[in-house]
Amino acid sequence: MHGLLLAAGLLTLPLRALAHPGHQSTSILSRRGAVDLDAYRVSAKAEYSNVNDVAENPPAVSLMSSGSYVDIATELVKTTLPGVTFRVVNDHYVGTNGVAHVHFRQTIHGVDVDNADFNVNVKDGKVFSFGNGFYKGEIPKENPMVKRDFSDPVHALKGACNALKIPIKTNKVSVKSGKGQESVVFKGTSGALSEPKGDLVYFVKPDGKLSLTWRVETDVGDNWLSSYVDAKDSSKIHGVTDYVADATFQVYPWGLNDPTEGSRQTLTDPWERNASEFTWHSDGNTRYPTTRGNNGIAQDNPSGGTGYLNNYRPQSSALRFEYPYSTSMSPPTSYKDASITQLFYTANTFHDLTYLLGFTERAGNFEVNNNNQGGRGNDFVILNAQDGSGVNNANFATPPDGQPGRMRMYTWNRSQPNRDGCFEAGIVIHEYAHGLSNRLCGGPANSRCLSALESGGMGEGWGDFLATAIRLKANDTRRTSYTMGEWASNQRGGIRQYPYSTSTTTNPLVYTTVNRYNRVHDIGTVWATMLYEVLWNLIDKHGKNDGPRPEFRNGVPTDGKYLTMKLVIDGMALMPCNPNFVQARDAIIDADEALTGGQNKCEIWAGFAKRQLGTGARYGRTNRVGSTEVPSECR
């Protein structure tokens, strides 16, 4: 195997321009000023019973120490909600921390309640924690499959396109039966990247009432929507989930902050074989002499179109991807080889790092060939460099496990010469983090569990946090602050209202600040600020590994930086669908209990409590209550 000599311009740009001018939703529809998708956000209704709740009120599960973890989880659901019908989602797995994750979907008359989920976490043959988001209201007596009391799915597609201004032409549409019950594929449309799909499902509306709907999936590039259209009145849209998440944050590459802080380096075989067993240039069946492999495929996309397999990418039979680049070069097409190479390097490095921290095949990561390690394959990340569909931004689409993710990186025109987002590792990391969190929260088969306002905010915050943690330098201390996006936006101070800092003078954000926010990126800044506090508490306790990969002892990272990242990632898999801050805090504390036996509980509590997410904190959509209290044993 030839060594890969990868000219990895560890150049980065902070993220100011990544935040949309003023504020814009993650949707291109909103940018057109046509539809505000935030008005259709799914409501968060799940309850989370953390490890302490389970210990204080043990569930009456007869299979506590016998049977498989799926049997134990199933028995818990049956005993918690007797008489409720449900199905096991086929995405259960055991995480690297030894906790098994099982997800359930409520059914009524054999029809899924699409936003009614129950997740159970099992450790050592016992229920560890669980989240309950099942519908608790009145069950319809009549089976809609018998009465056929619902509209034609074509009406639903046309209703969604009309109400949401989705640019798909439907005048020649027809339907073909899909794989499931009352599942269809829409034929004869134009304007979509793939054929729209429809499934008959129940949907719990924001008012708590149940409605029979058509879930209509439409991918038009900047938006990949799941729209819940009333099955009787196609003019009513009860909820919308967008698989696409825009970037508004920036973190820097491994080692360098941005092009002003260092030079590009030529790296040899930079992959981690424990995470990428086929290297970055093979899927186990084919060796690719280009920027393609098991984890991703990188190319330019100047037209902004949907195709990618036949797009340009650099070729090298010797796997020597060394191309010139400097910040003075212009136009961006003059250095597209370097741009594609940089994007391929950064995305693969993040894949390998998160794999070591628990985002494996079973957990729903992005790989073509899962090599019999569980999960669903055929889903590398499509990595589009210098994508012509936009400027001053980036986005990532996360469909369920088994379908490729899609990252689109744009050029930036806030400076002369223009800048290329691929050289800002933080942008790539933030985008890829959307794929990570959407696959882990709610399980790999459900990419709709960060669609509520507060959970969507945490989706943004996780990206900021991971980007910031990765950019820490050897001499940094808890007094070090970081902004986001200064280089990309060419604006001093970056794109966030405050820098990430443990100083409440520099950054005064606390839990109750969220009461004033109704945008996911603002909410995400509060969440990332809290995680930054936890990060430094654990670094002060365990030290900081400044290498590119963690070191482990008995499965636990030996330093505070990677330990925090591990707990945050493990916590994503524990929490319920569409969690709030309080539930996500509990899940991270539970993750520490599962991984270390709770050795870091007090440091974690102290970090959250400093920002008003202490033991007395209470969630409310507009009346969140803050608390600086910690458990008595931590005082």
From Swiss-Prot:
Active-site residues, record numbering mapped to chain: E431
Compartments reported by the entry: Secreted
Coiled-coil region(s): none
CDD domains (alphabetical): M36
EC number, UniProt record: 3.4.24.-
Keywords in alphabetical order: Glycoprotein, Hydrolase, Metal-binding, Metalloprotease, Protease, Secreted, Signal, Zinc, Zymogen
Segments of this protein annotated with the region Disordered: 279-307
Residues carrying sugar: N274, N413, N475
Cofactor binding notes: Binds 1 zinc ion per subunit.
Residues reported to bind Zn(2+): H430, H434
Record family assignment: Belongs to the peptidase M36 family.
Name of the protein this chain belongs to: Extracellular metalloproteinase 9
Organism: Uncinocarpus reesii (strain UAMH 1704)
